[in-house]
Design a protein with these regions (language model features):
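Residue-level signal for short, function-critical loop segments
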Residues: 54-56, 80-82, 136
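C-terminal helical cap/extension that packs against the catalytic core
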Residues: 14-15, 63-129
């Protein structure tokens, strides 16, 4: 059996993972760490971008702390889930700033998911990777955007 939105590669180098709680993020982090260990001779030289959003009723501080421990991540792109269920964008940014390595990691915020995705695609470089995590809503919306806007993305 295969679960949708579990490290699905939507386009070359663009992955969506439905990790939306502490256990899911922990599994996602372990998966990325294992990928890095197994492919050290084929390290990706481009940027590693994580697009993140979460619904407001989740315990998201531990999730953000775990994500910030991923040393291969160069950019965190925080965005807003539409419809009022998403966590506050400023609060999310503040937590990333608290836990990320300010020397090697950057934070970017976009209110619209489409803008976050467009920015991420523009900076990742040919050998870079983008990972979309934090919410099943986010995962589903990005999958839909990639299908609907094939020309743009």
């Amino acid at each position: 059996m295969r679960w949708a939105c579990r490290m699905d590669e939507l386009r070359p180098g663009v992955f969506v993972d439905g990790a939306h709680n502490e256990d899911g993020i922990e599994a996602f982090v372990q998966s990325l760490q294992l990928q890095q260990e197994l492919s050290e001779e084929h390290l990706h030289t481009g940027r590693c971008v994580v697009i993140f959003s979460v619904v407001s009723d989740k315990q998201y501080e531990p999730m953000i702390r775990m994500l910030c421990g991923l040393t291969m991540v160069t950019d965190f792109v925080v965005t807003q889930i539409p419809g009022g269920r998403g966590a506050n964008l400023s609060a999310l940014r503040g937590l990333f700033e608290k836990y990320m390595n300010q020397r090697t990691q950057k934070i970017h915020t976009y209110e619209k998911i489409e803008d976050a995705l467009a920015f991420s695609l523009s900076v990742r470089e040919d050998t870079g990777r983008i990972y979309i995590v934090g919410s099943l809503y986010l995962a589903g919306l990005v999958e839909s955007m990639m299908e609907d806007y094939d020309d743009r993305f």
